[in-house]
């Protein structure tokens, strides 16, 4: 039954959020009626603005309205005249102080509501419904969507009997709760009657809510900017120059080779090797002295005997 239910309502609290955020006890009925009137007011006369959704948040004595649009310049108007008019109409309707925020949709190609509006506008302009659907699908897939389904229902092509046709590209898991499915619906008014356009766009699987994911992405961007730069590297091993004993010895050898001309000067022995060879010298000296003393004593009588030979006496 995944294709029968509204994807936004099916995933509330999992991957999607409420578009109306307020609490009411006895005034619940009045608040719901006001929300419906506010959204109808935003849709009338603002077809060219490309409004994706309207978020409403109520506090005590105040009302905040967030308009997500692909063309904020049309909603704001020249020098903010259109925004002031909308704010005045909302205050007259609700009788409360209204805070109006106009937010731009960064990637309108993968926004289901805006895609549905675009297809409906083409149908109203007598464009072939198959061409409009395929063009919208190609644009969404190039924009980063992982799957899309577009459905048109009504008197397609001016036929006497109404029917429904849909095209799908990629993967659109309608019954997977962790799937981020965006859904949009819009009606096209043609000479033959109204044609309903429905769009499902699959953007990937998520476990966290959308607000938590945006906060995490902002934190990652901030840590990338604050990451310190590393020092210069030398050699294939990736260690910094002078960071190890071998590196310092090699650097000293290079400096001596440059100064002595020709590079034949021997490199200094590392401090660790010199310390290891020093204790062996004093240990070997006493043994050498003891071995040489008897040899000198034995050679003394031999020299005296040579001196007393007849050849020496004749001389």
Curated annotation (Swiss-Prot):
Tagged with keyword Chaperone: no
The residue ranges of the KH type-2 domain are: 38-106
Instruction: Locate the compositionally biased regions of type Low complexity.
Output: 265-315
Gene3D superfamilies recorded for this chain? 3.30.300.20, Ribosomal protein S3, C-terminal domain (3.30.1140.32)
A GO molecular function held by the record: mRNA binding
Q: Name one GO cellular component term.
A: cytosolic small ribosomal subunit
Q: Where is the composition biased (Basic residues)?
A: 222-232
Q: Which GO terms describe its biological process?
A: translation
Recorded hits in SUPFAM superfamilies, A to Z, give: Prokaryotic type KH domain (KH-domain type II), Ribosomal protein S3 C-terminal domain
Q: Which InterPro entries match?
A: KH_dom, KH_dom-like_a/b, KH_dom_type_2, KH_sf_prok-type, Ribosomal_S3_C_sf, Ribosomal_uS3_bac-typ, Ribosomal_uS3_C, Ribosomal_uS3_CS
Signal peptide stretch: none
UniProt xrefs under PANTHER family: 30S/40S RIBOSOMAL PROTEIN S3, SMALL RIBOSOMAL SUBUNIT PROTEIN US3C
NCBIfam families per UniProt: rpsC_bact (TIGR01009)
What family, per the record? Belongs to the universal ribosomal protein uS3 family.
The entry describes its oligomerization and partners as: Part of the 30S ribosomal subunit. Forms a tight complex with proteins S10 and S14.
Q: What does this protein do?
A: Binds the lower part of the 30S subunit head. Binds mRNA in the 70S ribosome, positioning it for translation.
State the protein's name: Small ribosomal subunit protein uS3
Q: Which gene encodes it?
A: rpsC
């Amino acid at each position: 039954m995944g294709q029968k239910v509204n994807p936004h309502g099916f995933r509330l609290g999992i991957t999607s959020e409420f578009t109306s955020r307020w609490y009411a006890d006895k005034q619940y009925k009045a608040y719901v009626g006001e929300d419906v009137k506010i959204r109808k007011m935003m849709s009338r006369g603002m077809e060219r603005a490309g409004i994706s959704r309207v978020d409403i948040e109520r506090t005590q004595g105040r009302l905040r309205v967030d308009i997500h649009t692909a063309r904020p310049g049309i909603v704001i108007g020249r020098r903010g005249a259109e925004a002031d008019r909308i704010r005045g109409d909302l205050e007259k309707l609700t009788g409360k102080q209204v805070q109006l925020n106009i937010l731009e949709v960064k990637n309108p190609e993968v926004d289901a509501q805006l895609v549905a509006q675009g297809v409906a506008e083409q149908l109203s302009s007598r464009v072939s419904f198959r061409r409009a659907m395929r063009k919208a699908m190609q644009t969404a897939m190039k924009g980063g969507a992982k799957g899309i389904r577009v459905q048109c229902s009504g008197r397609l092509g001016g036929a006497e009997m109404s029917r429904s046709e849909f095209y799908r590209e990629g993967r659109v898991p309608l019954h997977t709760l962790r799937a981020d499915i965006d859904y949009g619906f819009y009606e096209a008014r043609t000479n033959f009657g109204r044609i309903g356009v429905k769009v499902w766009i699959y953007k990937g699987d998520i476990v966290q809510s959308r607000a938590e994911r945006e906060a995490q992405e902002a934190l990652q961007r901030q840590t990338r900017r604050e990451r310190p730069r590393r020092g210069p590297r030398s050699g294939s091993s990736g260690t910094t120059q002078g960071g190890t004993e071998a590196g310092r010895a090699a650097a000293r050898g290079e400096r001596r080779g440059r100064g002595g001309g020709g590079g034949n000067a021997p490199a200094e022995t590392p401090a660790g090797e010199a310390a290891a060879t020093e204790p062996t010298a004093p240990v070997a000296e006493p043994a050498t002295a003891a071995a040489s003393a008897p040899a000198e004593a034995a050679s003394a009588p031999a020299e005296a005997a040579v001196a007393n030979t007849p050849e020496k006496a004749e001389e």
